[in-house]
Amino acid sequence: MRLPAVVLLAAISTALAGGVTVKTLVSPTETSNSYVEMVPVKPRTLRAFTLCMRVASKLKGEREVNLFAYRTRDSDELKVRRELDGRLSFYLSGVPALFEVPPLGALETHLCITCDSKSGAATLFMDGSKSMTKIYKKGHALRSGGRVIIRQGPDPHLGKFDAKQSFVGEMHDVNMWDSVLSASTIRDIYSGDRGPRGNVFRLIHRRAQSHRSSGHRPPHPPPSSSPSSSP
Protein backbone atom coordinates (compact mmCIF):
# COMPACT_ATOMS: atom_id res chain seq x y z
CA MET A 1 0.00 0.00 0.00
CA ARG A 2 1.34 3.40 -0.95
CA LEU A 3 2.07 5.68 1.99
CA PRO A 4 0.49 9.14 1.89
CA ALA A 5 2.73 11.95 0.70
CA VAL A 6 4.01 14.35 3.33
CA VAL A 7 5.67 17.75 3.28
CA LEU A 8 8.76 17.67 5.48
CA LEU A 9 9.81 20.95 7.03
CA ALA A 10 13.39 20.00 7.76
CA ALA A 11 16.92 21.27 8.37
CA ILE A 12 16.74 22.27 12.02
CA SER A 13 13.04 23.08 11.91
CA THR A 14 11.44 23.71 15.30
CA ALA A 15 7.85 22.64 15.93
CA LEU A 16 5.58 25.37 17.26
CA ALA A 17 1.94 25.40 18.26
CA GLY A 18 -0.05 26.11 15.12
CA GLY A 19 2.98 26.28 12.83
CA VAL A 20 6.66 25.65 12.28
CA THR A 21 9.78 27.72 11.97
CA VAL A 22 10.96 26.76 8.50
CA LYS A 23 14.56 26.41 7.36
CA THR A 24 14.10 24.14 4.34
CA LEU A 25 10.99 22.81 2.68
CA VAL A 26 11.57 19.21 1.60
CA SER A 27 8.91 17.78 -0.71
CA PRO A 28 9.83 14.11 -1.33
CA THR A 29 6.91 12.95 -3.50
CA GLU A 30 4.10 14.18 -5.72
CA THR A 31 0.95 15.08 -3.81
CA SER A 32 -2.38 16.79 -4.37
CA ASN A 33 -3.15 17.47 -0.72
CA SER A 34 -0.02 18.92 0.94
CA TYR A 35 1.19 22.48 0.70
CA VAL A 36 2.85 25.26 2.68
CA GLU A 37 1.06 28.55 3.15
CA MET A 38 2.42 31.97 4.17
CA VAL A 39 0.70 35.24 5.00
CA PRO A 40 2.35 38.60 4.26
CA VAL A 41 4.45 40.45 6.80
CA LYS A 42 2.30 43.49 5.99
CA PRO A 43 -0.54 43.43 3.41
CA ARG A 44 0.06 45.91 0.61
CA THR A 45 -0.60 46.50 -3.07
CA LEU A 46 2.61 45.91 -5.02
CA ARG A 47 3.59 47.97 -8.05
CA ALA A 48 7.11 46.55 -8.00
CA PHE A 49 8.57 43.41 -6.49
CA THR A 50 11.52 41.03 -6.29
CA LEU A 51 10.97 37.36 -5.47
CA CYS A 52 13.91 35.05 -4.69
CA MET A 53 14.23 31.41 -3.66
CA ARG A 54 16.75 28.57 -3.61
CA VAL A 55 15.46 25.45 -5.36
CA ALA A 56 16.68 21.92 -6.10
CA SER A 57 14.48 19.38 -7.87
CA LYS A 58 14.87 15.85 -9.15
CA LEU A 59 11.98 16.24 -11.58
CA LYS A 60 12.94 15.83 -15.23
CA GLY A 61 11.26 15.61 -18.60
CA GLU A 62 8.09 17.25 -19.83
CA ARG A 63 6.29 18.17 -16.64
CA GLU A 64 4.79 21.38 -15.33
CA VAL A 65 5.97 22.32 -11.83
CA ASN A 66 4.36 24.90 -9.56
CA LEU A 67 6.93 26.68 -7.41
CA PHE A 68 5.08 29.66 -5.93
CA ALA A 69 1.55 31.07 -6.06
CA TYR A 70 0.20 34.26 -4.51
CA ARG A 71 -3.57 34.04 -4.50
CA THR A 72 -6.39 36.34 -3.43
CA ARG A 73 -9.96 35.18 -2.97
CA ASP A 74 -10.78 36.10 -6.57
CA SER A 75 -7.70 35.18 -8.59
CA ASP A 76 -4.13 33.96 -8.86
CA GLU A 77 -2.24 37.25 -8.66
CA LEU A 78 1.23 35.74 -9.16
CA LYS A 79 2.39 32.26 -10.14
CA VAL A 80 5.93 31.02 -10.73
CA ARG A 81 6.35 27.70 -12.48
CA ARG A 82 8.37 25.51 -14.79
CA GLU A 83 6.57 24.88 -18.07
CA LEU A 84 6.32 21.58 -19.96
CA ASP A 85 9.22 22.54 -22.22
CA GLY A 86 11.49 23.45 -19.29
CA ARG A 87 11.16 27.22 -19.56
CA LEU A 88 10.60 29.17 -16.36
CA SER A 89 7.68 31.56 -16.23
CA PHE A 90 5.69 33.84 -14.01
CA TYR A 91 2.09 34.89 -14.44
CA LEU A 92 0.48 38.12 -13.34
CA SER A 93 -3.25 37.36 -13.54
CA GLY A 94 -3.07 35.79 -16.99
CA VAL A 95 -0.56 35.52 -19.84
CA PRO A 96 2.94 34.43 -18.69
CA ALA A 97 6.35 36.00 -19.10
CA LEU A 98 8.53 33.12 -20.35
CA PHE A 99 12.29 32.76 -19.92
CA GLU A 100 14.53 30.25 -21.69
CA VAL A 101 17.14 29.36 -19.07
CA PRO A 102 19.14 26.26 -18.04
CA PRO A 103 16.87 23.60 -16.51
CA LEU A 104 16.36 23.21 -12.79
CA GLY A 105 18.07 20.12 -11.38
CA ALA A 106 19.33 18.32 -8.30
CA LEU A 107 22.00 20.98 -7.73
CA GLU A 108 20.64 24.01 -5.89
CA THR A 109 19.68 27.00 -8.04
CA HIS A 110 19.20 30.54 -6.76
CA LEU A 111 16.24 31.97 -8.63
CA CYS A 112 15.02 35.59 -8.59
CA ILE A 113 12.31 37.44 -10.49
CA THR A 114 11.96 41.21 -10.64
CA CYS A 115 9.07 43.21 -12.05
CA ASP A 116 8.37 46.95 -12.18
CA SER A 117 4.83 48.09 -12.99
CA LYS A 118 5.77 51.61 -14.06
CA SER A 119 8.16 50.53 -16.82
CA GLY A 120 6.88 46.99 -17.35
CA ALA A 121 10.45 45.67 -17.02
CA ALA A 122 10.53 41.99 -16.00
CA THR A 123 13.77 40.07 -15.43
CA LEU A 124 14.83 36.64 -14.23
CA PHE A 125 18.10 35.94 -12.41
CA MET A 126 19.56 32.45 -12.15
CA ASP A 127 22.56 31.98 -9.85
CA GLY A 128 23.30 35.69 -10.08
CA SER A 129 23.16 35.84 -13.89
CA LYS A 130 20.58 38.19 -15.41
CA SER A 131 18.29 37.31 -18.31
CA MET A 132 17.26 39.66 -21.07
CA THR A 133 14.64 42.14 -19.85
CA LYS A 134 11.07 41.68 -21.06
CA ILE A 135 8.35 44.33 -21.13
CA TYR A 136 5.39 42.70 -19.39
CA LYS A 137 2.12 43.90 -17.86
CA LYS A 138 3.02 47.58 -17.74
CA GLY A 139 0.81 49.36 -15.21
CA HIS A 140 -0.27 46.14 -13.49
CA ALA A 141 -0.27 45.88 -9.67
CA LEU A 142 -0.51 42.89 -7.33
CA ARG A 143 -3.50 43.29 -5.04
CA SER A 144 -3.23 42.95 -1.28
CA GLY A 145 -5.20 40.54 0.89
CA GLY A 146 -3.78 37.30 -0.49
CA ARG A 147 -1.68 34.40 0.73
CA VAL A 148 1.21 32.42 -0.68
CA ILE A 149 0.98 28.72 -1.48
CA ILE A 150 4.25 26.87 -2.01
CA ARG A 151 4.68 23.60 -3.96
CA GLN A 152 1.14 23.73 -5.41
CA GLY A 153 -0.89 25.85 -7.82
CA PRO A 154 -4.69 25.83 -7.56
CA ASP A 155 -6.36 24.97 -10.85
CA PRO A 156 -8.87 27.78 -11.56
CA HIS A 157 -11.10 25.40 -13.54
CA LEU A 158 -11.00 22.28 -11.35
CA GLY A 159 -10.77 24.16 -8.04
CA LYS A 160 -8.21 21.74 -6.60
CA PHE A 161 -4.53 20.80 -6.65
CA ASP A 162 -2.98 18.60 -9.35
CA ALA A 163 -0.35 16.15 -8.09
CA LYS A 164 1.26 16.10 -11.55
CA GLN A 165 2.09 19.80 -11.18
CA SER A 166 3.28 19.70 -7.56
CA PHE A 167 6.86 20.57 -6.66
CA VAL A 168 9.16 17.70 -5.68
CA GLY A 169 12.53 18.65 -4.23
CA GLU A 170 13.95 21.15 -1.74
CA MET A 171 13.29 24.86 -1.37
CA HIS A 172 14.46 27.52 1.07
CA ASP A 173 15.33 31.22 1.37
CA VAL A 174 11.99 32.28 -0.12
CA ASN A 175 11.91 36.08 0.17
CA MET A 176 9.83 38.78 -1.48
CA TRP A 177 10.42 42.55 -1.44
CA ASP A 178 8.18 45.47 -2.41
CA SER A 179 10.81 46.93 -4.75
CA VAL A 180 13.13 45.89 -7.57
CA LEU A 181 16.46 44.92 -6.03
CA SER A 182 19.56 45.89 -7.96
CA ALA A 183 21.50 43.27 -9.90
CA SER A 184 24.45 43.70 -7.53
CA THR A 185 22.23 43.10 -4.47
CA ILE A 186 20.80 39.94 -6.05
CA ARG A 187 24.31 38.70 -6.81
CA ASP A 188 25.31 39.37 -3.20
CA ILE A 189 22.31 37.38 -1.94
CA TYR A 190 23.18 34.52 -4.31
CA SER A 191 26.78 34.53 -3.02
CA GLY A 192 25.55 34.24 0.56
CA ASP A 193 26.43 37.77 1.62
CA ARG A 194 24.11 39.34 4.14
CA GLY A 195 21.36 41.13 2.26
CA PRO A 196 18.00 42.70 3.05
CA ARG A 197 15.32 40.36 4.38
CA GLY A 198 12.11 40.14 2.43
CA ASN A 199 9.60 42.72 3.67
CA VAL A 200 6.56 41.13 2.00
CA PHE A 201 7.19 37.40 2.57
CA ARG A 202 10.11 35.48 4.00
CA LEU A 203 9.85 31.74 4.54
CA ILE A 204 13.13 31.22 6.36
CA HIS A 205 12.48 33.86 9.02
CA ARG A 206 8.72 33.63 9.45
CA ARG A 207 6.33 31.04 10.75
CA ALA A 208 4.64 29.18 7.92
CA GLN A 209 1.76 26.75 7.99
CA SER A 210 2.12 23.20 6.68
CA HIS A 211 -1.18 21.66 5.59
CA ARG A 212 -2.75 18.43 4.44
CA SER A 213 -6.12 18.92 2.83
CA SER A 214 -8.37 15.86 2.96
CA GLY A 215 -10.78 17.41 0.50
CA HIS A 216 -8.00 18.45 -1.91
CA ARG A 217 -9.53 21.94 -2.07
CA PRO A 218 -7.16 24.91 -2.32
CA PRO A 219 -7.36 27.45 0.48
CA HIS A 220 -9.13 30.80 0.10
CA PRO A 221 -7.71 33.88 1.80
CA PRO A 222 -9.98 35.89 4.06
CA PRO A 223 -11.62 38.99 2.55
CA SER A 224 -8.98 41.65 2.01
CA SER A 225 -8.91 44.96 3.81
CA SER A 226 -8.54 48.24 1.98
CA PRO A 227 -5.31 48.04 -0.04
CA SER A 228 -2.45 50.38 0.69
CA SER A 229 0.18 51.32 -1.85
CA SER A 230 3.76 50.28 -1.36
CA PRO A 231 6.32 53.05 -0.99
Kindly give the residue locations of the regions a language model identified.
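Extracellular glycan-associated modules
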Residues: 2-231
